[in-house]
Amino acid sequence: MDVNGHPKFQPSPETDGPLPLTSSTLMVSKSLQQDSLSMVGDRLPPKTGAVVIDMGTGTCKVGFAGQSQPTYTVATILGCQPKKQATKDQSELETFIGEAARSRPELRLVKPIRNGIVVDWEAAELIWRHILEHDLQVATHEHPLLFSDPPFSPATNREKLVEVAFESLHSPALYVASQSVLSVYAHGRVNGLVVDTGHGVSYTVPVVQGYNLPHAIQRLDLAGNHLTAFLAEMLLGSGFSLQQEDLDLVENIKHHYCYLAPDFQKEQARPDEECKQSLKLPDGRTVTLGKELFQCPELLFHPPEIPGLSPIGLPAMAEQSLLKVPQELRPHVARNVILCGGSSLFTGLEGRFRAELLHSLSPEDHVVVMAHPNRNLSVWIGGSILASLHAFQSCWVLREQYEERGPQVVYRKCY
């Protein structure tokens, strides 16, 4: 069912004819287009009580539905220590998240997400609780929660998410939405090919009328944190002294100075001296880097030969995903190729990706690549739009429904 509660068209390879546009599809599409445009401008849809949570490998983004951007974006890192004085009604642990946790060397840091998937539910819950209660300062039992979920997440993770939301956070209502679908909604569309490269994982997913096409998903377990590790290795190899706490400096270099070369072979052939840059770091030190600055993000286009790692990069992944979309549906997807995720923000990436994808496909495919300036927030913005739509309000999984049917209710209401 779509967000209006009507049956949705479910694409299959056997479908003949053009993509059907039902009245409900048109209504949803129009609502999404109107609201997504207003999110970018000065006008906003009415703020609802719902809270949107998009927790990725690198950052957790949280804010109220109807806002144009999350209220809090913090590193997905948790550190805990015993409270010196805790009452009987209080937790015995004092939690620190994000930079507050990093700044305390005495804490053991936990990263609850690996390659986009929650692997430590206790730590994930503590991060959510900390942001909701201490930062947003809301009573969790009063606010519906919309969570994003990777398109390749195990189904059991959704069940666990429902349990945490209702049993631990005591939310009155919940919805779990696919990250790729939310990214499409953020652009006012219901169809598109999402090319997402974030901190822990990269993937391409075709979306048709708000549904992922699972058979066409391409995944690459290489993203921002792997690029940071590569750059750190290059710095160490050049004699630059690095400690574990200096990884933030490496991240800073990566974000501000790394770029995708329009032509890698041509850039690689330039004399080393022409490529060198002297970089002033926030801590006052100076480092000289050269070809590492474009060799680092090049890994997204040409992954290293590592056992178990997909050998194809983002443009080839996008091509393979598109070619797996049924022919009659492909035009609706190809004209909305959406770049998103923090690692898509490298200078030169949009142009290089577009050029390689267009070169590999036929002009008849009419490929259009979209890259919004805030594409690192696409998933959260899509959730903010969806949860604030009037037509969506009947789609929440309510506490009463959970108590009646258990965590499996998520499969009936969240697609």
Curated annotation (Swiss-Prot):
Its main location: cytoplasm. Residues 1-22 are annotated as: Disordered. Pfam families: Actin. InterPro entries: Actin, ATPase_NBD. The keyword Ribonucleoprotein does not apply. One of its GO terms (biological process) is acrosome assembly. SUPFAM superfamilies: Actin-like ATPase domain (SSF53067). Keywords: Cytoplasm, Cytoplasmic vesicle, Cytoskeleton, Fertilization. GO terms for cellular component: acrosomal vesicle; perinuclear theca; sperm head. It is found in: Cytoplasmic vesicle, Secretory vesicle, Acrosome; Cytoplasm, Cytoskeleton, Perinuclear theca. Belongs to the actin family. Interacts with ACTL7A. Testis-specic protein that plays an important role in fusion of proacrosomal vesicles and perinuclear theca formation. This is Actin-like protein 9.
